[in-house]
């Protein structure tokens, strides 16, 4: 059975982490070898970049293009160190965010040049695309309310304006419309159990070779 890259995307508080954990447990119960990872922060270098990207610094804000380049650096290291080797070993990779996040957040959210973003994504990934992307679609205000309810301080991106997060959401909607064979929308407002059931059905349909 060949390796597969399955990406989970969505706005803040959409439930990616919980659904990835449930999906990993399900796949492992089928005898599938699973790797769970994330961007940013899927490598040792990435952990340092994650801190730089997400910590709030009022007096020294991260410039928007700098932010874009840091995400690209994290992704390049992640692809070479984690994604390619594990795919070659036949593993199923569940990845929390990938290239679509950069398009949605830095492209739609920040308004940066989309051509530049696409070029950087291609350079960072060497053309490696996901086999399937699960987009957990939830209203941005509901998602942010969930995040605040976690009792953990919001990071720099989570503290952006509602308008920013709505632009990000629009980015995901347009990406899903543009790449329907790769990106599948899941209603993230359903119960955790219902969302997981839908995800399992999607994986069985889209990924051949599951036991």
Swiss-Prot record:
Q: A GO biological process this protein is involved in?
A: dUDP biosynthetic process
Could you tell me which Gene3D superfamilies the record lists for this protein? P-loop containing nucleotide triphosphate hydrolases
| Statement: the UniProt record of this protein carries the keyword RNA-binding | no
Q: What class of enzyme is it?
A: transferase
Enzyme Commission numbers on file: 2.7.4.9
Which keywords does this Swiss-Prot/TrEMBL entry list?
A: ATP-binding, Kinase, Nucleotide biosynthesis, Nucleotide-binding, Transferase
Q: Name one GO cellular component term.
A: cytosol
Tell me yes or no: is Metal-binding among this UniProt entry's keywords: no
> Which Pfam family, any one, appears in the UniProt record?
Thymidylate_kin
Residues that, per the record, bind ATP: 10-17
Which molecular-function annotations from GO does this UniProt entry contain?
A: ATP binding; dTMP kinase activity
Reaction(s) this enzyme catalyzes, per UniProt = dTMP + ATP = dTDP + ADP
Superkingdom of source: Bacteria
Known role? Phosphorylation of dTMP to form dTDP in both de novo and salvage pathways of dTTP synthesis.
Family according to the record:
Belongs to the thymidylate kinase family.
- The name on file for this protein is Thymidylate kinase
Q: Which organism is it from?
A: Nostoc punctiforme (strain ATCC 29133 / PCC 73102)
